[in-house]
């Protein structure tokens, strides 16, 4: 049953045409295209989503010794940043981004365009959009 459902999802995903956001260009096939998945699931307490440090938070919040990220993001090109409890070796505070900000999504898509990606699949996990908070957040990201 799971195998059949997975095949159905695969067929549905690949049977629809792709439209680029800016130009409205329609592709008839995925052959030769470079596609990516986009989650957009990071939040910060002051981003307006009311989800706190979502997807950054470890077993005891988002603070030194408790986080779920493997690497600190390079944030120099983001327009809006959020101060964290983390500090760099020189003692300066570490900042990060929120996917809830339209400017963050714009930055990510600009990077993908600059590096030659042809399109993106917006990934929406059922467990993430089951509640109103998650649904509102991911709709905001999708509409950005």
Predicted regions and their residues:
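Secreted/periplasmic carbohydrate-active enzymes, especially glycoside hydrolases
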Residues: 1-3, 20-22
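Hydrophobic h-region of N-terminal signal peptides that target proteins for export
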Residues: 11-19
């Amino acid at each position: 049953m799971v195998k059949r459902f997975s095949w159905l999802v695969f067929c549905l995903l690949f049977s629809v045409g792709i439209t680029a956001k800016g130009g409205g260009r329609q592709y008839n096939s995925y052959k030769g295209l470079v596609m990516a998945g986009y989650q957009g699931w990071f939040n910060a307490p002051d981003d307006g989503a009311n989800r706190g440090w979502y997807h950054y938070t470890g077993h005891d919040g988002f603070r030194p010794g408790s986080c779920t990220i493997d690497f600190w993001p390079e944030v120099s090109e983001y327009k809006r940043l959020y101060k964290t409890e983390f500090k760099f070796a020189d003692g300066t505070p570490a900042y990060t981004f929120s996917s809830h900000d339209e400017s963050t999504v714009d930055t990510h898509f600009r990077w993908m365009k600059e590096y030659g990606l042809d399109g993106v699949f917006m990934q929406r996990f059922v467990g993430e959009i089951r509640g109103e908070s998650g649904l509102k957040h991911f709709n905001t990201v999708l509409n950005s």
